[in-house]
Amino acid sequence: MIKSLFAVIIGGSVGCTLRWLLSTRFNSLFPNLPPGTLVVNLLAGLIIGTALAYFLRQPHLDPFWKLMITTGLCGGLSTFSTFSVEVFALLQAGNYIWALTSVLVHVIGSLIMTALGFFIITILFA
């Protein structure tokens, strides 16, 4: 249990730090669809897709690494709550098209990046 906790703490602290750095760097560039939030969510999708494909090929890998990458790193890096509050703010301001665009770009983009990560590893290890 302690080992699992440390895996999540280590991965989460790296993920949270990356999220903060990327969001700080990019969000002011285009406030209607904050790119920092989008970048971290897309990056987390890519990482978890590559991790899933890799872990499927390494069934005996210590669960520590799986927890550190998926729950820790990707959980700390991605941010559904910030995405939600940004969409909510757009809706409150009457920017319905931007809100819908944000939802579509985040959800479809994250799915595409997850699939891309999965297929990159699948091709590399074929």
From Swiss-Prot:
Homodimer. The chain crosses the membrane at residues 4-27, 32-55, 64-92, 96-121. This is Fluoride-specific ion channel FluC. It is found in: Cell inner membrane. It comes from the Bacteria. Keywords: Cell inner membrane, Cell membrane, Ion channel, Ion transport, Membrane, Metal-binding, Plasmid, Sodium, Transmembrane, Transmembrane helix, Transport. GO terms for molecular function: fluoride channel activity; metal ion binding. It comes from Escherichia coli O45:K1 (strain S88 / ExPEC). PANTHER family: FLUORIDE EXPORT PROTEIN 1-RELATED. HAMAP family: FluC. It catalyses: fluoride(in) = fluoride(out).
